[in-house]
Amino acid sequence: SRRQRQMCIRDRGTTLGGDDGIAVAYMLAVLDDDTLKHPALECVITTDEEIGLLGAKALDTSVLKGTHMINMDSEEEGYLWISCAGGLSGTSRIPVEYQEMEGVVTEVLIDGLNGGHSGAEIDKNRANANKLMGLFLYELGQKTAYSIKDLSGGTKDNAITRSCKATLVLGEEDLAEAKITAEKLQKDLRTEYAGSDEGITISVTTGKEETVQALSMVSKEKVVFYLVHVPFGIEKMSGEIEGLVETSSNLGILKLGKDALYSTSSVRSSVGSAKEHLSAKLQYLTEFLGGSYEEQGDYPAWEYRKDSKMRDLMADVYEELW
């Protein structure tokens, strides 16, 4: 009917939170069925999960009377959520200085990576383009002198970065070395990431000789040091649940500005203290390089409970019914 169509939220190119939609449908079906026997239920539906759990944060839990909670965030039947990582975004600002540099302006692009969601696919052994750029810059610095004019990679902290671009200033006599370094590193990385990220490409495109503003040598070394040492990937696997990533981080956003290098990492852990310790590691690294660090969007972990009568009951009932 027309009224039913008006009540439906529609869009193109998005699932509209399909997993949460299933949970809402479950709850409405139970509430709508007068034949079901169950204790008093409180069905809680919040908004804006993906952009920071804003609805959940705004919820006044004092109005709730229940003592047990069931999380219905799974998009697949037969799966029950029993734990969830907490997280935060850690933003680093590392001050840098520029000076006039004369040389051939050269663009280095690391591309072709699979990327993915840092919460769901951090265990897939996929490379992060920002981290690979740090490796390239370090390797190049072992063989020749250069400076950095620009640097950027990624737009979302929770996405494993697919590409990163650096604009360098090199002497004309060092261009060949830059291309050799790129070719060798590309070959090595495709071997290292065989089966998970074999499409990695590192391209070097030379421009014309110019006099431009580029990082001072001290600032360049700070940037490279940060990229090489900033944490990425799995920090710790769970000791209780086989195959579960307990703690991880992802360097999702990287941008060289006029006065500082800016970066944002997504930090996750299903153990609250482990999340804090990993964030502290980012803070210490940033402050060691003379920078400042800020946490944003901090939300708590839902830690695994080894003994849970409700979980065991739900598993038994599911097996009995299906």
PLM features per residue range, with description:
Residues 14-101, 149, 238-242, 246:
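Acidic/histidine-rich catalytic neighborhood of metal-dependent amide-processing enzymes
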Residues 1-9:
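Single conserved hydrophobic/aromatic residue that forms the stacking wall/gate
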Residues 10-50, 106-110, 117-140, 251:
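Alpha-helical metal-binding/catalytic segments enriched in His/Glu/Asp
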